[in-house]
């Protein structure tokens, strides 16, 4: 946050206790409630660049409904429990005070699976602030996007990019657009990616870039999962791969017509932009609608001192 980054905080596996929800709901819900009460209290005064997410991939239980079978036994019950937990999450955060009353919240889909989350049984929670987005993950096809070596459930695939692959990607992105984006619900693809071991380099570039563009073109936010540092050097704050970096930059230029912070629209973010924003807040200069959009570093529709601070930090960090 000090570096003007967006941060998503969620519960992520945590030893697997969430798997016990179907058999020990009271204990699990109590633990879930206590965790989010404490997190909400600790971060209640943080700005909107901090997002809370209800869960990672753990909402959905094969012990209630076996998603891999053709049976629907237990399906409604399993979805109802997912919906109940997500509603509990929203209620806890909204009741905690501070900026949590309007904080952007990310609602975990059913197993963060696109097919299952687009099912009518999945329901977005009621939110008085109307600041909820849905979270899904994309690792399809799994033999390319997950496997590095042959496994019991499939053989590793080294290439990606056939017409069928592109059609499959567009099919899933269209599903999300129809189920959520077109209804005013933002979508964050909170994880997508693929390994590089035993993969064709051109296919890796194409897959990562294609998913990114498919999401951006439908006004969804893709987040590349790279905790192992395959593509991004966190110590140097730069991409390892210049080809992938160039691909991403082209996508941003194509689908993002506003460069946040570039208030004077000269193509870069400098101290001149900070001065211009300060002059606007002091009512010495007026901003056009496009300039005001670029100045809204917090993306909250309001220009104030928080935007000046964030913009100044950006200039100091990257110059």
Residue ranges and their predicted role:
Residues 5-16, 48-54, 188-191, 224-225:
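Short beta-strand segments at enzyme active-site cores
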Residues 15-19, 114-115, 195-199:
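Short, solvent-exposed loop/turn segments at secondary-structure junctions
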Residues 29-162, 174-194, 217-220:
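Active-site region of glycoside hydrolase catalytic domains
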Residues 163-252:
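Substrate-binding cleft of secreted/luminal carbohydrate-active enzymes
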Residues 27, 31-34, 38, 84, ...:
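Extracytoplasmic/secreted proteins, especially bacterial periplasmic and envelope-associated proteins
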Residues 13-30, 60-74, 203, 233-242:
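Surface-exposed, active-site-proximal loop segments in enzymatic domains
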Residues 1-47:
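Substrate-binding cleft of extracellular glycoside hydrolase catalytic domains
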Residues 257-319:
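Cellulosome-associated attachment modules in secreted, modular CAZymes
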